[in-house]
Amino acid sequence: MGAQLRVYKRRIQAVTATKKITKAMEMIAASRIVKAQRKVAASKPYATELTRAVTAVATGSNAKHPLTTEVETPTRAAVLLVTSDRGLAGGYSSNAIKAAERLRERLASEGKEVDTYIVGRKGVAYYGFRERKVEDSWTGFTDNPAYSDAKSIAAPLIEAIQKETAEGGVDELHIVFTEFVSMMTQNAVDDRMLPLSLDDVAEESTRKGEILPLFDFEPSAEDVLDALLPRYVESRIYNALLQAAASEHAARRRAMKSATDNAGDLIKSLSRLANAARQAEITQEISEIVGGASALADATAGSDK
């Protein structure tokens, strides 16, 4: 009985130490979510206005440009997958990977080859384990991305969209990331960045009661679009990275809270078992004392006779 009680006590100590760690990680993630939310909110107006500017240029001219011109029969697409560098975030990375797999299957069914680009060690490990080709990858900043990270990611993607497919280029550019909706809701989504769908933007503007402005372009609409292309791709990627970071922190906070709650329940269960073992040990000791006293009394009574 004593050995069993010691086992329970050691397990309670181990679970208590784990609970302290998960509680600390929960609090750290909660504090980082607030900062990430502010960055997301700050980046959205820039990305929105840049998209409107590109749409205004495209609708106000007949220029053919990778930003806005769809290929009649696209044959190759690039997919940028955003995952996390670290684990302990529930199904955050796996949900994004599943969304990327669904997108890849859809593009393949449309007769398009898929070039994969990955952000985050989890995605790199997933594709590496399955020996799948990855065009390029970036790691080390998923929980706190900077605009410079978005620029480094955008560079090879812009180069690919500007090339002909015969030279290794792509006709479409897609991104898969986790959209931050609220502290409790984060959704893995896929979005086509290029070519930009002018009909969707115009429809959204109409729904909001906005009128797209008309411009005169100097020196030309093509030159303006050339200047806007890298800014547009960088801003879209940066906003996606920020939303993914906020989603990662929210998922980690939720996972750590669940782990902390489970640790608390386990401690209660182990404490009950330890108390039961202690009571059984005490009962056994009392029984032994009573039994010994009874035997001694019987022996004494026998000697008196």
Swiss-Prot record:
Pfam families: ATP-synt. GO terms for molecular function: ATP binding; proton-transporting ATP synthase activity, rotational mechanism. It is a peripheral membrane protein. Keywords: ATP synthesis, Cell membrane, CF(1), Hydrogen ion transport, Ion transport, Membrane, Transport. It comes from the Bacteria. GO terms for cellular component: plasma membrane; proton-transporting ATP synthase complex. The keyword Cell membrane applies. It is found in: Cell membrane. One of its GO terms (biological process) is proton motive force-driven plasma membrane ATP synthesis. Transmembrane segments: none annotated. Belongs to the ATPase gamma chain family. Produces ATP from ADP in the presence of a proton gradient across the membrane. The gamma chain is believed to be important in regulating ATPase activity and the flow of protons through the CF(0) complex. F-type ATPases have 2 components, CF(1) - the catalytic core - and CF(0) - the membrane proton channel. CF(1) has five subunits: alpha(3), beta(3), gamma(1), delta(1), epsilon(1). CF(0) has three main subunits: a, b and c. This is ATP synthase gamma chain. It comes from Streptomyces griseus subsp. griseus (strain JCM 4626 / CBS 651.72 / NBRC 13350 / KCC S-0626 / ISP 5235). The lineage of its organism: Bacteria, Bacillati, Actinomycetota, Actinomycetes, Kitasatosporales.
